[in-house]
């Protein structure tokens, strides 16, 4: 059996990890970095770029560069947060046939799980390159406050990427696992405050020693799935746009190219201001008008940035308060505060958290890597490589059904330990009612319409009877991934109907299978493209080095040699512009052959000059 890898599929960055010889190892990607930007771009020549290469070309290709797609995963197009996002991103967010939020790039409409799958494929390949063997199984993390549709969509993304997702686990819980594995024995209660690129979670977790086993029990969780570093960047972008408008009278909001440059600059300035007191944002040629090019130069102090985002930081405190209340614990009883997510590097965030909990956060947990490390530990637990860990997570939101009068009746309360199963008996609302619709909801509001609809199904052929007589038993069953299975049974006839909640949206099995096939077909295409790109690069490099060599050689090159080399160079340049790898290889060989005598002359001369 192969290794089960741990993947932190983040809004801004992703990370992959593995447990090896009892130690957790974060795996560097092909570029040598321990985290990979969660960015996917579709280049004009059809190449799909993922990570740093996608980020680098974002400025010149803003409409086809997709970032922060995790904020759309498992969401309906009509949701307020999606409508808000449409105004903020340079790429197109569109309404799919099933009402979900999809994205459009390179003239194609795609589901968010397809985009996330590209990032997961990169993480999978990173692990395979390191291990030297195929990887087919993974534990993937999600924000603790993700609802059922978002969890299901994340699982779908794994499937499209060719991964068997063994478990979906909550990010704060994973971070606690990474933190708690090497701690001294004994019981302690920790807070994991996770402010990432797009989401915020807080979990109260009790780490206990039970019969020689490390037990991690989540007591309560809360959060906001649309609050993170991207919002902090946006505040800074808005400020820069306003400052530029005051100075030049020009609005950069309608210029996708300028916005993409501003996004990069804002992210960079925000990071710099975590260690410096001030920084300059200097963007020459940001735009132009009839009078000529315009340059943006704005000085930003740490205090200015803090004033721009203060309310966002304050917004994270209320979920902390609710989580403590739900866990029945006072802030003074918390032993350790663990900060996770890149945005927690901001001094203002650290100060607010320390003020609220009355203690400084620990500094020995890497905020970018802890979640992936915890996922790898959970993978090792599932593989049987780690025996002394028990993880007890919770369902983050209340689950129930719609009952008479549009009321939501709860079956499983929020913060219930999972896996769990609950049943309740309901009846009919009308005389001789022959069918009931089970409308499954998730949320904390009493009014059914105010909660997230997860799906509907019918239990039909109920024998005629006065209202209130039939007994319909509804069962909710949440698995260890936090994914819900619902069943309904007519107790008189024994007739049952059940569904795995796929939401009234989400991807069908057929769609996922098609996307898996597309991904497999693309893999072969990608391989050919990589080979062609490598051949082109080799050709370009040879043209450059040959021309330089001829120039350096001067009159040591005969007219005959010069003519032959120039003809071979022109032929290779023409081949490089085409799509035929074999033709490029042939012209490379030809140029190497005709330039070899000159190279030998130069080498002989250099050797003679050396003492």
Swiss-Prot record:
- The answer, when asked if RNA-binding is one of the entry's keywords, is no
Q: Name one Pfam family in it.
A: HSP70
Q: Which top-rank group of organisms is this from?
A: Bacteria
Gene3D superfamilies reported in the protein's UniProt record? 1.20.1270.10, 3.30.420.40, Actin, Chain A, domain 4, Substrate Binding Domain Of DNAk, Chain A, domain 1
- Could you tell me what induces this protein? By stress conditions e.g. heat shock.
Residue numbers bearing the Phosphothreonine modification: 199
User: Which InterPro entries does this entry report, sorted A to Z?
Assistant: ATPase_NBD, Chaperone_DnaK, Heat_shock_70_CS, HSP70_C_sf, HSP70_peptide-bd_sf, Hsp_70_fam
Q: Which GO terms describe its molecular function?
A: ATP binding; ATP-dependent protein folding chaperone; unfolded protein binding
Listed SUPFAM superfamilies: Actin-like ATPase domain (SSF53067), Heat shock protein 70kD (HSP70), C-terminal subdomain (SSF100934), Heat shock protein 70kD (HSP70), peptide-binding domain (SSF100920)
Q: Which UniProt keywords apply?
A: ATP-binding, Chaperone, Nucleotide-binding, Phosphoprotein, Stress response
Task: Name the PANTHER family on file.
Answer: HEAT SHOCK PROTEIN 70KDA
Q: Which family does it belong to?
A: Belongs to the heat shock protein 70 family.
Protein role:
Acts as a chaperone.
Which NCBIfam families is this protein grouped with?
Answer: PRK00290.1, PRK05183.1, prok_dnaK
- What is the official name of this protein in its record? Chaperone protein DnaK
Q: Which gene encodes it?
A: dnaK
């Amino acid at each position: 059996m192969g290794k089960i890898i741990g993947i932190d599929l983040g809004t801004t960055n992703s990370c992959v990890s593995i447990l090896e010889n009892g130690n957790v190892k974060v795996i560097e990607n092909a570029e040598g970095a321990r985290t990979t930007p969660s960015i996917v771009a579709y280049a004009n020549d059809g190449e799909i770029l993922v990570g740093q290469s996608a980020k680098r070309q974002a400025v010149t290709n803003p409409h086809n560069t997709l970032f922060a797609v995790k904020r759309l995963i498992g969401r309906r197009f009509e949701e307020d947060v999606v409508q808000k996002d449409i105004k903020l991103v340079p790429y197109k967010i569109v309404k799919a046939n099933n009402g979900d939020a999809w994205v459009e790039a390179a003239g194609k409409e795609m589901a968010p799980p397809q985009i996330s799958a590209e990032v997961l494929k990169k993480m999978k390949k990173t692990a395979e390159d390191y291990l030297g063997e195929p990887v087919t199984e993974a534990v993937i993390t999600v924000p603790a406050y993700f609802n059922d549709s978002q969890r299901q969509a994340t699982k779908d993304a794994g499937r499209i990427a060719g991964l068997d997702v063994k478990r979906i686990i909550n990010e704060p819980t994973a971070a606690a696992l990474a933190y708690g594995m090497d701690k001294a024995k004994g019981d302690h209660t920790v807070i994991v405050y996770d402010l990432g690129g797009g989401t915020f979670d807080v979990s109260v977790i009790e780490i206990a020693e039970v019969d020689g086993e490390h037990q991690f029990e989540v007591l309560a969780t809360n959060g906001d799935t649309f609050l993170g570093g991207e919002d902090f960047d946006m505040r800074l972008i808005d400020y820069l746009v306003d400052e530029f408008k005051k100075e030049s009278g020009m609005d950069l909001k309608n210029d996708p190219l300028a916005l993409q440059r501003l996004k990069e600059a804002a992210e960079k300035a925000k990071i710099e201001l975590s260690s410096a007191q001030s920084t300059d944002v200097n963007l020459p040629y940001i735009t132009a008008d009839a009078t000529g090019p315009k340059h943006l130069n704005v000085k930003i102090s740490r205090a200015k940035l803090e004033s721009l985002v203060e309310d966002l930081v304050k917004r994270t405190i209320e979920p902390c308060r609710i989580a403590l209340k739900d866990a029945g614990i006072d802030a003074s009883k918390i032993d350790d505060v663990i900060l996770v997510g890149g945005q927690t590097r901001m001094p203002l965030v650290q100060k607010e958290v320390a003020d609220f909990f009355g203690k400084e956060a620990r500094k020995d947990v890497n905020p970018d890597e802890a979640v992936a490390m915890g996922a790898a530990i959970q993978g090792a637990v599932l593989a049987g490589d780690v025996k002394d860990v028990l993880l007890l997570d919770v369902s983050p939101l209340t689950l129930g059904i719609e009952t008479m009068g549009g009321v939501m009746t709860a079956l499983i309360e929020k913060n219930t330990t999972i896996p769990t199963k609950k049943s309740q008996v309901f009846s009919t609302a009308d005389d001789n009612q022959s069918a009931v619709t089970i409308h499954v909801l998730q949320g904390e509001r009493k009014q059914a319409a105010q909660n997230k609809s997860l799906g509907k199904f019918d239990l039909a052929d109920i024998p005629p009877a006065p209202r209130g007589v039939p007994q319909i038993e509804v069962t909710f069953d949440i698995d260890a991934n936090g994914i819900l299975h619902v069943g309904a049974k007519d107790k008189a006839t024994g007739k049952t109907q059940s569904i795995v909640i796929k939401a009234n949206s989400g991807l069908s099995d057929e769609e996922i299978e098609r996307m898996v096939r597309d991904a497999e077909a693309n893999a072969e295409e990608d391989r050919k493209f990589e080979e062609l790109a490598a051949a082109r690069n080799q050709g370009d490099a040879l043209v450059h080095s040959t021309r330089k060599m001829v120039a350096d050689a001067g009159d040591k090159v005969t007219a005959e040699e010069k003519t032959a080399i120039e003809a071979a160079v022109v032929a290779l340049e023409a081949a490089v512009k085409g799509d035929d790898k074999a033709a490029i290889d042939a012209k490379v060989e030809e140029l190497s052959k005709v330039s070899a005598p000159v190279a030998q002359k130069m080498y002989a001369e250099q050797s003679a000059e050396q003492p």
